[in-house]
């Protein structure tokens, strides 16, 4: 059974510069850490949650270790300077998934996300493998049942695989099937896709599903496509698979990208999403601390989370 645990206070440590000025603060000094999972107490805040699960990665024949991602990313975030927006972060702990009950863990995450959103929070989830996206996305769909929800994925992979059980490669097929079951439109855009890492069958599935696809080669000039997608939906769920980044920026994932989309381009793509007023949920997935020897990759991933919270409107 998936268990909830509060985040350890030892994760939120850093350099104390407060002697210099009242606003010389870092995230470890402004993040609120909750000892209970009680989103109803934190309206208008951002729920920072971990999904400590890599069962989907294992099922997808990937490199396990992403279950350690949430706490590694917290440690990297802790010492970053606190600016406007970061005071809204409330750490609502980790959902720790037992092996091999991925489906049960996804349902628990789905319910937790829906509860947060219905309480007036927004959700920033730290994975975990990309199996995180089905639980997170389903919770968003549940919370906004009467509105159109757009799913924006920055990823080298389409993750529309067809298998007999859930994996880290199936979340968007699962979300498409959920939309079908609910008789609602499936609005999905994937930026940073590597043609070399996706079979023709996956491209055919994306075309059949009317997915907006932007290849890694074209992300430098994709702001118009991003704006067009934002305009056509009411609410947005943003998910960033860190393997969208090039291997030299992000080696600490299950499947590092030989080409990838540089961090600066990823940031420019997500800025209008964060500032749109439509973003309700975001996550960072696939970070694997086992392959981050000096913590540099954690800082790259944390910068994305830092920027999302800062820009979020």
From Swiss-Prot:
> Keywords in UniProt for this one?
Histidine metabolism, Hydrolase, Manganese, Metal-binding
Cysteine disulfide partners in this protein: none
An example of a Pfam family matching this protein is Arginase
Single GO term (MF): formimidoylglutamase activity
What cofactor does this protein call for? Mn(2+)
The EC number(s) given in the record are 3.5.3.8
Q: Does the keyword Kinase apply?
A: no
**Any note on cofactor binding?**
Binds 2 manganese ions per subunit.
Q: Which SUPFAM superfamilies match?
A: Arginase/deacetylase (SSF52768)
Q: Which residues bind Mn(2+) 1?
A: 130, 155, 159, 241
Q: In which pathway does it act?
A: Amino-acid degradation; L-histidine degradation into L-glutamate; L-glutamate from N-formimidoyl-L-glutamate (hydrolase route): step 1/1
Functional note: Catalyzes the conversion of N-formimidoyl-L-glutamate to L-glutamate and formamide.
**Similarity-based family:** Belongs to the arginase family.
NCBIfam families reported for this sequence: hutG
* PANTHER family noted in UniProt: ARGINASE/AGMATINASE, FORMIMIDOYLGLUTAMASE
HAMAP family noted in UniProt: Formimidoylglutam
Report what the protein is called. Answer: Formimidoylglutamase
User: What organism is recorded for this protein?
Assistant: Salmonella paratyphi B (strain ATCC BAA-1250 / SPB7)
Upper classification of the source organism reads: Bacteria, Pseudomonadati, Pseudomonadota, Gammaproteobacteria, Enterobacterales
